[in-house]
Amino acid sequence: MSIIVVRARSDVTVERSIRETMSHLNLTRVNHAVIIPENPQYKGMLQKAKDYITWGNADAELIEKMISERGRLIGDKPVTDADVKSSTSFGTIKDFAKAIASGDATVKDMPELKRVFRLHPPRGPKGWGGLKRTYVIGGALGPRGDDIGALVERMI
């Protein structure tokens, strides 16, 4: 399984250890997203930065859309099927996305692909929905489960 993590808040006046945790996750700016594997080390990092990020389970279609529309290679070039085929054992972006979603591959398996996806702020009348409250009580922060897809769709 893989997890999509999106940074929702700035790190101004934030404790140093939390700022470093977000840096280790490669979330250096607001509206940046990363795809990480699900393991205990990352779970601890997510829990530490829970007041500044939101995360949820990644599915193959969402990962495919993120890579094809917002994924960038070194030099700020868009990702194509030919790039995926030349640098990985997968033939298309769709196959690569399925492998990432199932946990058989990571974004690091394609060395030229930047690990951070630069997204738009959430479009629509709701926006983030409250940056000071958790998702469970109507805000934007913390774990979302499968509902992360709706947020990322509005940000792509």
Please name every model-derived segment:
Residues 1-156:
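Core subunits and conserved enzymes of cellular information-processing
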